[in-house]
Each structure stands twice: as C-alpha cells, then as structure tokens.
Regions:
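Feature activates predominantly on carbohydrate-active enzymes
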Residues: 2, 8, 12-20, 24, ...
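Short, well-ordered secondary-structure micro-motifs within conserved domains or adaptor modules
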Residues: 33-57, 67
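Catalytic domains of carbohydrate-active enzymes that cleave complex glycans
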Residues: 38, 421-422, 448, 473-541
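Conserved radical SAM core fold
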Residues: 162, 250-258, 292-294, 359-368, ...
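Substrate-binding cleft/loops of secretory-pathway carbohydrate-active enzymes
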Residues: 215-222, 333-368, 425-434, 460-470
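Active-site neighborhood of glycoside hydrolase catalytic domains
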Residues: 263-333, 337-355, 360-365, 375-378, ...
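Structured mid-domain segments that build the active-site/substrate or prosthetic-cofactor binding neighborhood
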Residues: 264, 274, 377-497
Length: 541
C-alpha cells in the first residue's frame, strides 16, 4: 500500500520532514509514501500562520486521511514524530536503533482517529553541548531533540573543538590511542553539524564564553586551553588582580578584563558584531564574560561599580552596533558567577534584542524550584564582595538574585541548568534527578522563565535516558503526569517486567546523592556511606 502525501512547502526543510515521515511509515506499517498534488493527497503536510512564536502542532487523521501542520519548521518535524508516538513509537535515546517501534498493520493506520491541537508550554526547549563527543554522538543527539519535543541546540564556542578533542584524542582514557584530529577536521565536522541543525529547523545557539579571550587575541574555539601567557601590549586590557595583570590561571577563557578601559568594550563589540555578520544562521548569539569567579578587575575605576553595570553598558553598545548593521541576531546575556548580582545603575536600552539566561551552576539538585517556600524563605541578596564571593547552593539564595534581575529586565528569559552536567553522576538510578527535572520544568512559568536549556554531557544515558526524555516531554506539555511518563518510557525500554526494573532504579536513587557528588555538604557522612553500601548490595538481592 502507498500513502499519497502533499508537500505544501517543497523546500529543503519539508523534504527532510517527509524523509522522516517516509522512514517511519515504512518501519511501522511497511508502507511507502508517494508525493502528489494536493487534490490527490491522503496526507497534507505544511505550515500554518500563528502569532504565538511557540511551536504549535495540528494533527488530524481519519480513515487514513489527514493533515500534519505547524507554524514552524521544527514544529512540523515534531508533529510527524508526535503522530507516530500516537501509534506507540517511543524515542528512548539518541540513535534510530534505540526507537521502540511496534509492528503494526496498514489497517491499524486506516482505523486510527487523531485530533491533536497542541502548543508547546515553553518557547526555549534545548540542550547545550558538553562532555567528550564524537561527530556521531552529536548528530544522533541533534536528531533526537525534536523527537522528544525539543527545538534548540547550543554549540559552545566558535566550533565544538573542545568536545571533539576530548573524544578523538581520548584525553581522559589512557587505554585508547589518540585518533586523527586537526583544526581542519573540526571545522569540517562543525560545518556538517550546522547543516544538520538547519535542515531540521532547530533554533541555533552559539558561542557563550570566549569573547574575553578573543579581545586578547585567543580564539574561542579552543575552549579551556591553558598554559599560556599574555604579551605586554595586551596587559592593559586584562583585569588587575593583586596589583598584577596576567591571564587568570594561564587560561584566556578564565580571564576577566578591565572593563573601565574603553578600548576593551570597543574591541569586544567589534569582534562580536563581525561574528554576527558572518553567521546569520545563528539565531541566539551568547555573549558571556569569563568562565571563572573572583577574577574581577580591582583597578581604581572598576572598583567604583559592579561588573554587571559594565556588562550592561557593553551589551547596549553591542545592540547599537548590530542595529547599525541591520542585524536582528538575538543576544543571550548571562546571570552567572559575579553576574548573579543585578546591576545597580544600568538598564538595557532595547530589551527586545536580548534574552536573559539564569545559570545557577552551584545549586542543589536534592530539591526542586517547586519545593521552595516563596512566601517565607527567599532571602535578601547578599551584598557583593569583589573577588570574595561564595556561590550559593540553596535554591532560595539563587532565586533571590534572579528576582533582583527581573526587577530591571522584563524581557524574554530561560533557565540554563545543570542536572545532567555533573549532578547526574551522583544519582545511581537516574530516577531522583528525573523527578527534580520534572518538577523544575513544571514550575518554570511561576518563575517567569520561558524555557530551559540543559548544559550537559550528551552521552548522559547510564543506566537510561529518562532524565532527558522527561525534560523534553515536560517542556512541550508541562501538565503531563510523572507516573504516565514513567510507564510510557520504561515499558518501551524494558518490556513487561518494567515495573520491577523501575523499583530497583528508584532504590538506587534513594541511596545515592547528587549533592554529595557535587561537593555540597560534608565529605564525611556516615549515613550516606551506609546508603552507598546498601546500594552496592542491591544488585545481589
């Protein structure tokens, strides 16, 4: 049998979407598709107009005839995957080979009635690359994102050199020999990944840290490279700390600048503007400062104000430069380290240009935003002490800084969070971290945040990928039941005995600690030591 399909768009994006439709029609129903004109079609695939920028999916099906429509390119792809999910397909982890696909008859397709009209709960729904990754790891993950309802991918730095290098040179694995690796290879792989993002219509985030190093003449593509020194001519640009101007811990990416020096802002703005001109494919360009704390300039001029006030002035200067070039690139600015403290004087002149990103990197993951007593437990933000800050673990203190920023900025924003960046290693069953993600995402709108980007290892999937699955599903529809998600995912992954597997995983999680792994709390903990001993013995019981 053949399903006749009309492609309204007839472009690169819709062509890929139809390839996916064809693949899953064949895999689920052993049925091919044929492209025809609209009047002959069984299935109409196309775009609709909708003022809401959030992805909106419309799916109708009755007696083998219907429509798959969306207001966005990536939404159209999400809609196709969503339709097959209604037939029992579960996208359990990155890579086609990990899809759970039931074997159905063509008659099952003809008998199905669908009427789905859904708008994503949040606009920002994505992941930022971390870890050690092969090209295939990254591509599989990008391919997985719309299958679980996500619409964004963030490649840190100019290209993913740092993450590919860790994989191909096996930096942390002495048992494997280095593979062929070069700057030219990285750029080739990076260009290929950009095309994969584009053909799926995924929202493209880029760079982040590295601009401070660029001002000093070091490329952001090399990430956290260290062991370097600064020339005398560049020292006036570098933050003065303890009377000296040197690279912080010998790493450009960790080095802050003297933002009272007007040449610093001019150079940074020019570099960012030139990058934006060359990369119109980047939807959200992240402009962050250094990736270290307690490294802020102590010169007489810088001591007169907060670094966040200096940051806002640079962002306003950047906005003017981009506007003069006719560039509509969105700029993400960061609440992180010293920038957690809100500016005292400056405000953004053009809020529409900017998206605020709240990054509570030292937060606890033993509780959720939804667990906070907002009426009684949010403290007054601590006063800023230059180069003596201690970042908070508590959600209450972290949120106190966010709320101060929200008094000065009412525009678009999202949380940039880290459950799968480090904390997940402390959860042996991956169930406690999954529930924290579930509750966090369900509560974001109460914090006036319009989504979530997960800063994470892409290969965070042991013993399963339920944390990311929950993340994607909840960002798409925040009212979903946690119990429903558990059954949907684990019954596909483990079959009829899934409940006993989940029971074991939940026990593992209950006897382990994300915070302990993240160095939160005492290193000597007799209770936790006993819990780990119990977890160790669970495998034999």
């Amino acid at each position: 049998m053949v399903i006749r399909v009309f492609d309204q768009q007839k472009n690169t994006y819709s062509s890929f979407a139809l390839e996916e439709l064809s693949y899953y029609m064949n895999r689920v129903f052993k049925t091919n598709i044929e492209l025809v004109e609209e009047k002959e079609a069984d299935i109409f695939v196309g775009l609709v107009n909708k003022e809401d920028r959030r992805d909106h999916v419309l799916i109708s099906l009755d007696k083998g005839k219907g429509r798959i429509e969306s207001n966005t390119i990536v939404g159209l792809l999400i809609g196709i995957y969503r339709m097959f999910h209604e037939f029992g397909v579960v996208y359990t982890r990155p890579g086609r080979g990990h899809d759970f696909v039931p074997e159905l008859r063509f008659e099952d397709f003809l008998d199905k009635q669908l009427s789905i009209d859904e708008t994503a709960s949040y606009y920002h729904r994505g992941v930022c690359i971390e870890g050690a990754d092969s090209f295939e790891n990254i591509l599989d993950f990008i391919d997985w994102l719309p299958k679980i309802g996500m619409n964004s991918f963030f490649i840190q730095f100019e290209n993913p050199y740092s993450f590919l290098k860790r994989w191909y040179e096996h930096e942390f694995n002495p048992y494997l020999n280095k593979e062929q690796f070069s700057n030219e290879l990285v750029q080739e792989l990076s260009d290929r990944l950009d095309k994969e993002l584009q053909k799926r219509g995924l929202i493209h985030h880029r760079v982040g840290h590295g601009w401070t190093g660029e001002v000093l003449g070091y490329s952001s593509k090399f990430g956290w490279e260290s062991g370097l020194s600064i020339s005398e001519e560049k020292k006036p640009y570098v933050a003065e700390i303890n009377g000296k101007r040197e690279l912080f811990n010998t790493a450009p990416i960790l080095t802050s600048l003297d933002f009272s020096n007007p040449d610093v802002a001019d150079k940074m703005v020019e570099i960012i503007k030139d990058y934006a001109k060359k990369r119109p494919d980047v939807n959200y360009l992240h402009v962050w400062l250094s990736d270290a704390r307690n490294n802020i300039c102590e010169c007489e001029n810088c001591r007169q104000e907060l670094v966040s006030d200096q940051y806002i002035r640079i962002l306003n200067q950047l906005d003017s430069a981009l506007t003069s070039e006719g560039l509509d690139t969105k700029i993400c600015f960061l609440l992180y380290h010293e920038l957690l403290w809100a500016p005292q004087k400056e405000k953004l002149d053009n809020p529409e240009r900017f998206t605020m990103m709240f990054a509570p990197i030292t937060r606890t993951f033993e509780m959720s935003y939804a667990d906070v007593d907002f009426d009684n437990s949010i403290p007054t933000p601590k006063p800023y002490l230059r180069n003596k800050i201690i970042l908070p673990n508590s959600l209450e203190e972290n949120l106190s800084y966010l709320f101060e920023w929200q008094k000065t900025f009412k525009g678009d924003s999202f949380v940039y969070d880290y459950p799968l960046g480090r904390a997940h290693y402390g959860d042996l069953g991956y169930m406690k971290i999954s529930q924290t993600i579930y509750k966090d995402v369900s509560y974001l709108s109460n914090l006036h945040l319009n989504g979530y980007i997960s800063c994470q290892e892409l290969r965070a999937g042991f013993p399963h990928n339920f944390p990311n699955y929950v993340m994607g599903q909840m960002l798409w529809k925040k009212t979903r039941s946690y119990e429903e998600l558990i059954e949907e995912y684990f019954s596909a992954l483990y079959g009829s005995n899934w409940q006993s597997v989940v029971e074991y995983l939940e026990k593992l999680s209950s006897y382990s600690s994300c915070d302990y792994f993240n160095a939160i709390g005492s290193r000597q903990n007799d209770v936790l030591a006993n819990h780990y001993y119990i977890a160790y013995n669970l495998a034999d019981n």
